[in-house]
Curated annotation (Swiss-Prot):
Its main location: membrane. It comes from Rickettsia bellii (strain RML369-C). This is Uncharacterized membrane protein RBE_0082. One of its GO terms (cellular component) is plasma membrane. It comes from the Bacteria. It is a multi-pass membrane protein. The chain crosses the membrane at residues 1-21, 33-53, 67-87, 101-121, 124-144, 185-205, 220-240, 253-273, 274-294. Keywords: Cell membrane, Membrane, Transmembrane, Transmembrane helix. The keyword Zinc-finger does not apply.
């Protein structure tokens, strides 16, 4: 029943998104994007209340912790998506179409990765320690790397698409496919969709291990992941400006990853409750936001 409720909510949100709010290829303003994202955030929080009444307080804390971590870790994803759109010169009015169908792929691929990960961890518990090393290494690296980049032209996937598929030289409106001389062609819009799906899989390799350190409950992991990604895609059109304002969040994220990695290593000796993980996550994110605001105010005064 819980899965039916979740998928009903997601289906309703997708219908509302494509069938009502974005029925026409109109450019979303900063304010509209912000309000739409706030709407998604509210739905995500309300779903946490549903989890509280059906699964208990600990599961609720795990849900919110996973949600916040996935939200924070997906920020770099937005920059790479921007690079892809710029490379293919995708107009803003068509970008939402790509993001929407990208969500459909995310819903499917994340399910496979999460369930596959849970099966592997249940069978080989030592994998968690490998995840811990990856998380700590990623956290340390985050202090030294500004944003993840993506060399599209030299990527294996892009070269393979160009080599094996018929590709139109220019966009064909909002179409992913066109037929010419009885041959099927893919458009740059479709290639951008494939690359965005591939990038999401790459980023999931970073974020999902962090979630496994919080809980191995498939329902908590999957629902928090999907709600976080839905809200982030809604915020895409104003996120670049927001991330620029909150530039220190990446350091908060680095500390969160290191904390989670350490938590895995010590869990046999010290059991860290779900409420502490949630408190640490919220505190570090808020510190990153406050530090960013203070820094921006200082810069603006100079």
């Amino acid at each position: 029943m819980s899965w039916i409720i979740f998928y009903t909510i997601i289906f309703a949100l997708l219908v509302l998104d494509l069938g009502v709010i974005h029925k026409k290829n109109e450019v979303m303003s900063f304010k509209q994007s912000l309000l739409f994202s706030l709407f998604y955030f509210t739905i995500s929080c309300l779903f946490g209340i549903y989890i509280y009444y059906n699964m208990g307080a600990d599961s609720t804390r795990e849900y919110y912790t996973c949600f916040l971590i996935e939200k924070a870790m997906s920020l770099d994803n937005i920059f790479v998506i921007s690079i892809i759109f710029q490379f293919f010169k995708i107009p803003q009015k068509y970008q939402h179409r790509v993001l929407f169908f990208g969500i459909i792929g995310v819903i499917a691929f994340r399910a496979v990765m999460i369930y596959g990960g849970i099966i592997l961890i249940n069978k080989f518990s030592w994998l968690l320690y490998i995840f811990a090393v990856i998380l700590i290494a990623t956290g340390v690296k985050t202090f030294y790397v500004s944003h993840k980049t993506f060399d599209i032209q030299n990527s294996y996937l892009y070269k393979s698409i160009i080599k094996y598929l018929n590709v139109t030289p220019n966009l064909e409106g909002d179409k992913f496919f066109v037929t010419r001389n009885k041959k099927l062609y893919v458009t740059p819009l479709f290639i951008s969709l494939i690359l965005i799906e591939a990038i999401d899989l790459v980023f999931a390799i970073d974020s999902i291990p962090a979630i496994f350190a919080i809980t191995n409950d498939a329902y908590i992991i999957y629902t928090s992941n999907i709600f976080a990604i839905l809200g982030l895609r809604a915020l895409f059109f104003c996120l670049a400006e927001i991330v620029e304002r909150f530039s220190y969040i990446k350091y908060s994220l680095a500390l969160i990853l290191i904390f989670i990695g350490i938590k895995i290593f010590i869990h046999h000796y010290i059991a860290i409750p779900a409420y502490i993980s949630l408190t640490v996550t919220i505190t570090l994110l808020l510190l990153g936001i406050f530090a960013s605001v203070i820094r921006k105010n200082i810069v603006d005064r100079q």
